Regions:
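Short loop/turn and low-complexity linker motifs enriched in small/turn-promoting residues
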Residues: 41-178, 182
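Structural marker of alpha-solenoid helical repeat scaffolds
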Residues: 172, 205-206, 240-241, 275-276, ...
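Alpha-helical linker/edge segments of TPR/alpha-solenoid repeat scaffolds
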Residues: 137-138, 228, 258-263, 297, ...
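Canonical tetratricopeptide repeat
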Residues: 182, 216, 250-251, 285-286, ...
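Structural signature of tandem alpha-helical TPR/SEL1-like repeats
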Residues: 155-165, 189-202, 223-236, 259-271, ...
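Start-of-helix register in tetratricopeptide repeats
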Residues: 140, 178, 212, 246-247, ...
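Terminal, low-structured helical/coil segments at or just beyond the last alpha-helical repeat
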Residues: 293, 301-338
């Protein structure tokens, strides 16, 4: 039974059996959450290190105001804001982002068969026409195929196909840092972590300051149970991005959770949520689970409910509805106990 198939079963069984079923629901939601977050930004193992003082680099992006931005481009084009993926244009080539923080941004747009474009956007702008030019660059086309293959991959055979496509792109263009990072992600998905680290190193040769590469490096180190190295890489990513690197903030949160530093983990999740402008509901599930560990049940329920508000039909929704009921019952029982 797949994770997706198990979620509805988990929700129903939890209502019938009650608290004994709850650990299974937690486990299933965790599996599904990890899978969901792996695709977050295209998206972490325990350490025995002592708790360390939590301090993240301040973000330079304004979080106090936001507006909408409508991008017009090719149908099915992927849109990034400041290197954070925010969505895909519809069949008419339109994507409206309802929450874009104030300040200057860089909008990156990519569509299969076209040359990628990057456009700076000044504060107050509400519309952007991103006109793409068709490309015959074989390296670029292979890279685009690799990205699509990795995102759609459901098993190791498909992931290996993505690896092969990235490798072909790099043979055609040796200096291709974004392809090295994509290949690192694909290798990490295959648990080839040493090879993945080599690709991060290769990416930095032509782009020494590369926030996404540092964030992916942090994830690889966490998979290898090197918590201190993971922390350094995530902090480097945040520093390189002047504070705006949600993947790294989530990665740090996972490391802090591993160490039992739940307050610090919750703070990092909250930063990531603000930077992603509610575009990734799965982080609310992670935040809710952290609040539960802190026995902050009201906050946990609020986080879970926010997930359901943003993704009422999401793959985690059935289990999360069940968990909300369980958390409320647990909170009520604790209030009754003298």
């Amino acid at each position: 039974m797949s994770v997706r198939q198990t979620l509805p079963y988990c929700a129903a069984a939890s209502r019938d059996i009650g608290k004994p079923m709850r650990p299974l629901c937690r486990y299933v939601v965790l599996l599904a959450t990890v899978a969901a977050f792996s695709t977050l930004v295209h998206s972490q193992k325990p350490s025995k290190q002592r708790a360390q003082t939590h301090k993240s680099a301040p973000t330079t992006q304004s979080q106090t105001s936001s507006g909408s931005l409508t991008i017009k481009s090719e149908p099915g084009a992927i849109v990034w804001v400041d290197d954070v993926r925010r969505g895909v244009t519809d069949s008419s080539g339109t994507l409206t982002l309802t929450k874009v923080t104030g300040g200057r941004h860089v909008i990156r747009v990519r569509a299969t068969g076209f040359k990628e474009s990057s456009t700076p956007v000044l504060p107050g702008r509400s519309h952007l026409a991103a006109r793409l030019v068709r490309t015959t660059d074989e390296a670029e086309l292979k890279f685009q195929q690799a990205e699509e293959a990795r995102e759609k991959a459901k098993d190791d055979d498909a992931r290996q196909q993505a690896v092969d496509l990235y490798s072909q792109a790099l043979k055609l263009r040796a200096s291709f840092p974004v392809a090295h990072v994509g290949l690192a992600r694909a290798l990490m998905d295959l648990n080839k972590n040493e090879n993945a680290l080599s690709e991060i190193e290769a990416a930095r040769k032509s782009r020494p300051s590369y926030p996404e590469a540092s964030a992916v490096e942090g994830r690889i180190f966490r998979e290898m149970a090197f918590a201190d190295e993971a922390t350094k890489s995530f902090q480097r990513a945040i520093r390189e991005a002047n504070g705006f690197q949600p993947e790294a903030h989530v990665g740090l949160a996972r490391v802090y959770e591993d160490r039992g530093q739940y307050e610090a983990a919750a703070a990092e999740y909250q930063v990531a949520i603000k930077q992603l402008s509610d575009s990734e509901p799965v982080i609310y599930q992670l935040l809710g689970a952290t609040y539960e560990k802190l026995e902050k049940y009201k906050e946990a329920v609020a986080a879970y409910e926010k997930y359901l508000q943003l993704a009422p039909n999401g793959s985690l929704a059935p289990a999360i509805r069940s968990i909300i009921d369980q958390v409320r019952r647990e909170a009520s029982s604790r209030e009754i106990v003298p």
